[in-house]
Amino acid sequence: MAHKKGVGSSRNGRDSNPKYLGVKLFGGQAIEAGNIIIRQRGTQFHAGDGVGLGRDHTLFALVDGTVAFSIKGPKKRRTVNVIPA
């Protein structure tokens, strides 16, 4: 028999940091060039006119203007545009 009590160890107790994904500016809001519109994993929203796509699929404004969302094409893709001011 063991002379010491076996101490169990839990394999839980880890959690990843929050990623703060989602829409940062909504339709009709004013935006400046370089501002982030959406942080996302994959292309849930696609870049339209005046919008750039970052390495991590972040959508950002290329020009100053107003944010506009639309659904285009047969695949019903959600696109984000920036209408120049």
Swiss-Prot record:
Pfam family, one: Ribosomal_L27
Cysteine disulfide links: none
GO cellular component: cytosolic large ribosomal subunit
Key words of the record: Ribonucleoprotein, Ribosomal protein
GO molecular function, one term: structural constituent of ribosome
InterPro entries per the UniProt record, alphabetical: Ribosomal_bL27, Ribosomal_bL27_CS
Keyword Kinase tagged: no
GO BP annotations, alphabetical order: translation
Keyword ATP-binding set for record: no
PANTHER family: LARGE RIBOSOMAL SUBUNIT PROTEIN BL27M, RIBOSOMAL PROTEIN L27
HAMAP family xrefs: Ribosomal_bL27
Similarity comment: Belongs to the bacterial ribosomal protein bL27 family.
Protein name: Large ribosomal subunit protein bL27
Source organism (scientific name): Xylella fastidiosa (strain 9a5c)
